[in-house]
Design a protein with these regions (language model features):
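Hydrophobic helical membrane-anchoring modules
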Residues: 134-136, 140-173
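Conserved core of the sugar-phosphate nucleotidyltransferase
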Residues: 6-11, 27, 39-137
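Catalytic metal- and UDP-sugar-binding loop of GT-A-like glycosyltransferases, i.e.
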Residues: 34
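Short aromatic/hydrophobic "clamp" motif used to bind/position activated sugar donors
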Residues: 31
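Conserved N-terminal catalytic core of the sugar/cofactor nucleotidyltransferase
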Residues: 1-26
Length: 173
């Protein structure tokens, strides 16, 4: 059984790809993973991601992300006694006080669109590999908590007509 609380994306994708092979079903060159926890997407952005990975032949996968407003280099842990503990070994309490512009931008994986290569997965028994492309997307809302769901519902009400127009256009094609 692969559907457990600690199951990974690799677990279910690898299971699926092996099942396709076992059943003698030709698998596609690419698998596109659209996570249900990121429900609001622009199809044009997904098309750009597909074109991007097709152009980058040496890539092993593509993972979407948006630039974080803050860098993880400024984050810290709290010790059992309530004191600062660094997340990154080079960061002292003084270093995390530097302006965020002094740090390289970091990307937050967001589930907008991830693309995998089934042949690579079967051969290497890895999902992403060392040549994972970063595909920058607009910032998006992931539904991880009730608060996020409330934000999505508010946006849905605000943009209901745009969504209906888009869906009607698809129906006609």
């Amino acid at each position: 059984n692969i559907s457990k609380k600690d199951s990974t994306d690799f677990d279910f994708i690898f299971h699926f790809v092996r099942w396709l092979k076992k059943e003698g079903i030709d698998f596609p060159k690419y698998l596109i993973h659209l996570r249900p926890t990121t429900p609001i997407r622009n199809p044009k952005v997904i098309k750009k991601a597909i074109k991007f990975i097709i152009r980058k032949k040496k890539s092993t996968s593509l993972r979407s992300g948006h630039i974080s407003a803050e860098t993880f280099m400024k984050w810290f842990y709290k010790s059992d006694k309530g004191y600062f503990e660094r997340v990154h070994k080079s960061m002292t309490a003084e270093n995390i006080d530097k302006p965020r512009q002094k740090f390289r931008p970091v990307y937050i994986p967001n589930g907008y669109v991830d693309i995998y290569k089934p042949e690579f997965i079967l051969k290497k028994k890895k999902l992403l590999g060392s040549q994972m492309l970063v595909f920058e997307t607009p910032r998006c809302i992931e539904v991880d908590e009730i608060y996020d769901l409330n934000v999505i519902n508010s946006l849905k009400e605000k943009n209901k007509q745009k969504l209906l127009n888009f869906l009607n256009k698809i129906k006609r094609k």
